[in-house]
Amino acid sequence: MRHKILWASIAAGTVVVLGVAGGAYLLLRTKGSPTATARAFLSAWARDDATAMRGEALAPPPDLDQQYQTLRKGLGVTKVQASPGTESRQGGEATVPFTADLTLPMGTWHYQGRLRLKTDHREWKVIWSPESIHPDLHSGQHLTITYRWPKRARVVAADGSPIDGTDVSGSVQQIVGTTAALTDKQAKKLGTSYSKGDIVGQSGIQQRFDKRLAGTPTASVIVADASNHPVKKVGGFAGKAGRDVKTTLDQHVQSAAAAALQGQTKPTSMVAIRPSDGQILAVANYPGGFDRALQGTYPPGSTFKVVTAYALLRSGLSPSDTVECPKAANVGGQVIHNSEGEKTGDMTFTEALAQSCNTAFALQTQKRLNPSRLSSAANLFGFNQKIDPGMHVAAGSFPSPTSTSEMAVAGFGQGRDLANALSMAGVAAGIAGGTWHPPVFVSDPQVAQKAKAGRLDSRLRSELATMMRAVVTTGTAKDAGLPAGTAGKTGTAEYASGKDGKDPPTHAWFMGFHGDVAFAVIVEGGGFGSKTAAPIARRFLNAL
């Protein structure tokens, strides 16, 4: 019986000894693994958690967080992804390789790194050094990125010839715009890929299409010393060459327009458009300083009568129908007069347009149209449309008339009607080609258009074109010497009140088409369109 008790006691003692030894082993064993610590460290880096990174590192430097902030700012890092590979151990240390993917402005930079680890108080810790960021990074160094921009592409005419130099007319230079070297402040505002001295577009097409023209820079990730001198290239991205911006400008037509404006003593502008597709062939301003051809706004005067004439033809009035053209007419309380010297009396509708009879148009507008019908015709020819030729322009504006008298005045281009050479050249182009096309100046890249093309009734278009030819052959422009086959319309637009009993000052207009070229000319304060603007059109057409 004693033996059984003894053996039981011995057995119990053995269990106690083994239990104590097992507990000591558990207390002395190193916690975790090098891979687990590396994963925690890399995860903290990815979420920009410097406190957590310190917790996984052995004696981290005081500027640990600053080192990683320098990395983010220097490279423009927006995202970090890093994952550990297979660990290896030697003695009391371990190495864990990692894969890093840093999202930079130019793309994702992929590289391989490694972390060294050792145990400290039975825990694996990262032995931090600059090599923990990148294997080629050493004390006193940092990573940065440099950019080299490609040669800037060109703004070119329809035939591919450059138009972004100083050898083109000032009107073209205004549209193309300017470039300039960035200041340090401007470069910082644009982002890390820009530096002081880089060339960027400042205005016009150069500014709007800057990214296309500039291309993308070649970027090099480099190790740099404390003075920011490059030590070694460790990564990079290939840049892309800029691409030309192609315009519809026709150099020959542009030269003809510019020459036609030479010698003018008052501000003058002209636009030429190809009727078949709405492409802008020429833009000319004299003098320079303000792009009045595209951005100016003026009452169109009697040139707008072609729009009203189309609305009247659509209402059933025929070119051969007889209309009244009194010297004066009272329409809704508004007394309408004709310009001095204009023929009056009964005449055909064609003659009323050819002679530019204000009263005939006012009376027929009152009789046959309403604000909706007149506005519909204006919209068909591009008024009130959101046009975008590829540069900043002012579209024609035709507010819907609110009274009979206002409609009568609006019908011959006064009141609140506003236009410029671009919008009236577009009207002429619509009549010449049968469709009003949203004007286009930049053809490549293609600019999205909100404006919709307006298709004219073919019979009415033909009738209106014939009526406009009568303006040149027998009407107000018969003495301008325009080439045979020209169709057009003169305009004399009041823009202020007369003083001391004198007639109000007027802008001089002429718009029309010949072949596949439509155009409009306006001379500010030029008086009568037949005497001032039509001769400019003659010089232009003769030079083509």
Predicted features and spans:
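Beta-lactam-recognizing serine transpeptidase/beta-lactamase-like catalytic domain environment
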Residues: 232, 268-297, 311-525, 529
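Extracytoplasmic/periplasmic proteins that interact with beta-lactams or build/remodel peptidoglycan
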Residues: 73-269, 507
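Short regulatory alpha-helical segment in sensory/regulatory domains of signaling proteins that mediates
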Residues: 42-46, 72, 261-262, 382
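Solvent-exposed, polar/charged alpha-helical surfaces in well-ordered, non-transmembrane soluble domains
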Residues: 35-43, 47, 51, 55, ...
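Soluble non-cytosolic domains of exported or imported proteins
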Residues: 32-36, 47-48, 59-62, 150, ...
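Short solvent-exposed beta->alpha transition segments
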Residues: 30-36, 40, 47-97
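Hydrophobic alpha-helical transmembrane signal-anchor segments
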Residues: 2-24, 91-97, 116, 123-126
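C-terminal region of N-terminal signal peptides and the immediate post-cleavage residues
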Residues: 4-11, 17-50, 436
